[in-house]
Amino acid sequence: MKQQANLIRAGQVIEHDGRRWTVLKQQIITPGKGGAFIQVEMRDLKTGNKTNERWRTADTVERLMTDNRDYTYSYTDGDNLVLMDGETFEQFLVPAELLGDQAPFLQDNMAVIVDLVEGDPVGIHLPATVTLEIVEADPVVKGQTASSSYKPAKLSNGVKVMVPPFIEAGERIVVRTEDSTYVERAKG
């Protein structure tokens, strides 16, 4: 389906120069002189190579329709994730590299959504937030509680996040998987 270049969004799959690309980032740039254009960072689905492309906002681009399927993560087998279809109980292999920076947040039996183009996996979406335990946190400095400063903490999956000063090691917190940021203390 053809669409204007200014409607491209991160996560979409497009066809350009006879190859399929997944859009990683997009930015509309309006220079002081001349017309606006869109700068797109994208990755080749076959080779994994990244490139930047620049189009005028009125240019058209071929967008491929994706089919979203629900799966449950079972285990990792080498460079692949083994996912299970909840309806048919069939196993499905997906390259682990599709997770990118979100890989540390993948947990056993986690529900994930896989984007497919003609049966080929092109992206994986984790839940928006996960609950993890803090294994290391700097102690609170007296007088620091009045300010809105954050302190570094290490999660059980090895990821480092910035947390409020009242959070201590051993507590469970909710973390946003998209950008590894603290959301709140876990309830219960």
From Swiss-Prot:
GO terms for molecular function: translation elongation factor activity. It comes from the Bacteria. It comes from Acidiphilium cryptum (strain JF-5). InterPro entries: Elong-fact-P_C, NA-bd_OB-fold, Rib_uL2_dom2, Transl_elong_fac_P/YeiP, Transl_elong_KOW-like, Transl_elong_P/YeiP_cen, Transl_elong_P/YeiP_CS, Transl_elongation_fac_P. The keyword Repeat does not apply. It is found in: Cytoplasm. Keywords: Cytoplasm, Elongation factor, Protein biosynthesis. One of its GO terms (cellular component) is cytoplasm. Pathway: Protein biosynthesis; polypeptide chain elongation. GO terms for biological process: peptide biosynthetic process. Involved in peptide bond synthesis. Stimulates efficient translation and peptide-bond synthesis on native or reconstituted 70S ribosomes in vitro. Probably functions indirectly by altering the affinity of the ribosome for aminoacyl-tRNA, thus increasing their reactivity as acceptors for peptidyl transferase. The lineage of its organism: Bacteria, Pseudomonadati, Pseudomonadota, Alphaproteobacteria, Acetobacterales. Belongs to the elongation factor P family. Its main location: cytoplasm. Pfam families: EFP, EFP_N, Elong-fact-P_C. This is Elongation factor P. SMART domains: EFP, Elong-fact-P_C.
